[in-house]
């Protein structure tokens, strides 16, 4: 280990930055956030330094480097564009046993600045020891996506409860189990983020009054239409925290690779026209695993509340008193249309969009008269097997036979394929496509020739 990671208490302590440009400004911002009493020494200053000085946040010393400014300092940063000046700052600091950072010159520095993930009071620092700042930045960005923005609020609130926890729970084991429940409670975290004091207090009292045995819960997560990059940050956080993930065929392998490695996985294989596991049995799997005290993620393609039967699954949990929450996802209509160059609405062609299931309960019938109306876009989910009927009904109820149509197979994935034509060809086009696929009907489909971007990459 070439560098010892430490966190410095700089509040109300003298620090010096030599340099008045953009790099110095970024370093100054960090030191000011840490509460340092800051002096900045440079020949010239960018405007932000003058703003800070006028607000009394720091002291500016205009002119060449003055090493006597180091005499009262705890820490220094050399951030000029002159290597000779930077080395002088480093040498002067070294002779006074003051830690000094030299920007872009780690070998000349006695300390280096890490990439920081700030969820104060929780802080995470990432460093490559100065060998690869870009790698450190990329790792920081990845960690940023994994750590919720409200984590700092949760940590601060935990600090307020420490005395009460210590008083109520006699052993370290009991306290540990309480904190484990506390920090994974999504309802508490969301209430803190929303500054909902009433909900925070209610959830806190429930945590203190419940048995310490972990209470199970279910999180319904929308995985999006295929591309793993379209999974939401909150969705990623949830699958990283799951004890067990119950998923179906529409969830891509790339997304499943993001699931916590030691989480159990249950494949239920749902797709239109074929249910590897009946819906009622899926409901019971969720209920059973949650009753064991597990954190269950039900991972569904697209958005769980748009033709995903998510509402039915949650009704079962609600009836049994199992806590649940929902993380929405990008629905297939939005993702597939965007990746196909087909805007769902357009000022000239469509003032509304309808999401329609082509997979009806026995005896069900759609409102074909309204579906055949002008100036709208229709998106049919699970409609491949009914494509010929959709074609026949729309024409029978007045839709023009030359209405553009598109079928998007494996939308947003590297296997995406789009076939398009006009309404009179819909039944025939459906024979060329395999599930999962989406049917889009409307004048906006004609824009695909101009707006298609994904297949060109």
UniProtKB/Swiss-Prot annotation:
What reaction gets catalysed by this protein?
Answer: uroporphyrinogen III + 2 S-adenosyl-L-methionine = precorrin-2 + 2 S-adenosyl-L-homocysteine + H(+); precorrin-2 + NAD(+) = sirohydrochlorin + NADH + 2 H(+); siroheme + 2 H(+) = sirohydrochlorin + Fe(2+)
Residues where Phosphoserine occurs? 128
Report residues binding S-adenosyl-L-methionine: 225, 301-303, 306, 331-332, 382, 411
Question: What pathway or pathways are given for this protein in its record?
Answer: Cofactor biosynthesis; adenosylcobalamin biosynthesis; precorrin-2 from uroporphyrinogen III: step 1/1; Cofactor biosynthesis; adenosylcobalamin biosynthesis; sirohydrochlorin from precorrin-2: step 1/1; Porphyrin-containing compound metabolism; siroheme biosynthesis; precorrin-2 from uroporphyrinogen III: step 1/1; Porphyrin-containing compound metabolism; siroheme biosynthesis; siroheme from sirohydrochlorin: step 1/1
Domain of life of the organism in this record? Answer: Bacteria
Which InterPro entries does this chain map to?
A: 4pyrrol_Mease, 4pyrrol_Methylase_sf, 4pyrrole_Mease_sub1, 4pyrrole_Mease_sub2, CobA/CysG_C, NAD(P)-bd_dom_sf, Siro_Cobalamin_biosynth, Sirohaem_synt_dimer_dom_sf
| General function of this protein | Then it catalyzes the NAD-dependent ring dehydrogenation of precorrin-2 to yield sirohydrochlorin. Finally, it catalyzes the ferrochelation of sirohydrochlorin to yield siroheme.
Q: What is this protein called?
A: Siroheme synthase
